A protein has these predicted regions:
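Symmetry-related core transmembrane helices of the 12-TM Major Facilitator Superfamily/SLC fold
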Residues: 134-149
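Juxtamembrane intracellular "pre-TM" segments in multi-pass secondary transporters
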Residues: 154-184
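Cytoplasmic helix-loop-helix junction between adjacent transmembrane helices
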Residues: 73-110
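C-terminal ends and interior cores of transmembrane alpha-helices
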Residues: 50-63
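Residue-level signature of mid-helix packing/kink "hotspots" within the transmembrane helices
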Residues: 22-26, 30, 114-115, 224-228
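Short amphipathic helix-loop junctions that connect adjacent transmembrane helices
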Residues: 1-12, 199-214
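Pair of pore-lining "gating" transmembrane helices in MFS-fold secondary transporters
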Residues: 1, 5, 177-193
C-alpha cells in the first residue's frame, strides 16, 4: 500500500520490490546460519535485531524505485539472519525433552506477533501516516535487541553436538539427498503461494473492496490470530 499509494509505483515495480525482499531474506537466512557457526548464535541474534532498527529508520528517506529495491534487499539480508540463529539457540535454552514444545511456542509467538502487527500497523497509518511505521519498526527492532542483551543470558559456550549425532563421515550431502530436496521444493511451492498475500491481498482489499488501511490491518491480523488459536 505504501509503495503504490505514497511512492506511486506500479504493480510490476511492487513485484520487483517484493522479489528484492525475498532475495534479501534468502541471503540473510544463509548468512545467519554461517555466522551462527562462525561467531555463535548469540551475537548473530543480537546484531540482526539492532542493525535493522537503524536501517528501518533510514529506509523512509529512500524515494526511488531502484533505491528502494536495493535498500529493502539490504534490510532483509540483515534482519533474516535472526531466524537460523534463533532456532540454533533453542538447543541452549531448552532441555532435550522440551525441544519440540519450544519450537511450538516459538511458532505461536510468531503467529501472535503476526496478528498484532498488521492491526497495529493499520491503526498507526490511520492516525500518524505511513512514515511513522519506519520509526515504529526501527524502534521495535532496537527494543528487541535490548531485550536479548539485558534479559537473555549469554551461554558460557555454544551447545555441544548431540550425543547421538551421526559422525560427519556418514552425513549426506543435502544436494544429493532426494527426500530432502523434495521437501525443500514443497516448502518453496508453499511459500510461493502463501507469501503473495503480503503484496496482493492488501491491494485487493483497497482497490476492489475500497477498504482503508485500518480495516485491512485488522483483517490481516485476524489471519495470524486464527492460526495462533
Amino acid at each position: 500500500l505504501y509503495l503504490t499509494g505514497e511512492m506511486g509505483l506500479s504493480f510490476q515495480q511492487v513485484g520487483w520490490v517484493m522479489s528484492a525482499f525475498g532475495l534479501g531474506s534468502l541471503v540473510g537466512s544463509w548468512a545467519g546460519g554461517k555466522l551462527s557457526d562462525k561467531i555463535g548464535f548469540y551475537p548473530t541474534m543480537l546484531w540482526s535485531m539492532i542493525t535493522p532498527g537503524l536501517l528501518f529508520f533510514l529506509l523512509q528517506f529512500v524515494d526511488s524505485f531502484m533505491g528502494f529495491c536495493i535498500a529493502i534487499f539490504l534490510v532483509m539480508s540483515v534482519a533474516d539472519m535472526f531466524r537460523p540463529a534463533m532456532f540454533v539457540s533453542l538447543r541452549a535454552y531448552s532441555k532435550p525433552e522440551n525441544r519440540t514444545r519450544s519450537v511450538t511456542l516459538v511458532r505461536l509467538a510468531v503467529n501472535l506477533g503476526f496478528s498484532v502487527g498488521p492491526a497495529a500497523g493499520g491503526l498507526i497509518i490511520a492516525k500518524l501516516g505511513y512514515l511513522s511505521l519506519f520509526w515504529v519498526d526501527g524502534l521495535t527492532c532496537f527494543l528487541a535487541g535490548m531485550v536479548i542483551l539485558l534479559f537473555l543470558p549469554k551461554p558460557a559456550s555454544e551447545p555441544p553436538p548431540a550425543v547421538d549425532a551421526p559422525p560427519k563421515a556418514v552425513l549426506k550431502d543435502p544436494l544429493k539427498d532426494g527426500p530432502y530436496l523434495l521437501f525443500l521444493f514443497t516448502v518453496f511451492l508453499t511459500g510461493f503461494v502463501f507469501l503473495q498475500c503480503f503484496s496482493s491481498i492488501p491491494l485487493y482489499y483497497r482497490d476492489v473492496h475500497g477498504l482503508a488501511e485500518q480495516p485491512i490491518g485488522l483483517l490481516l491480523g485476524l489471519n495470524g490470530f486464527l492460526i495462533f488459536l
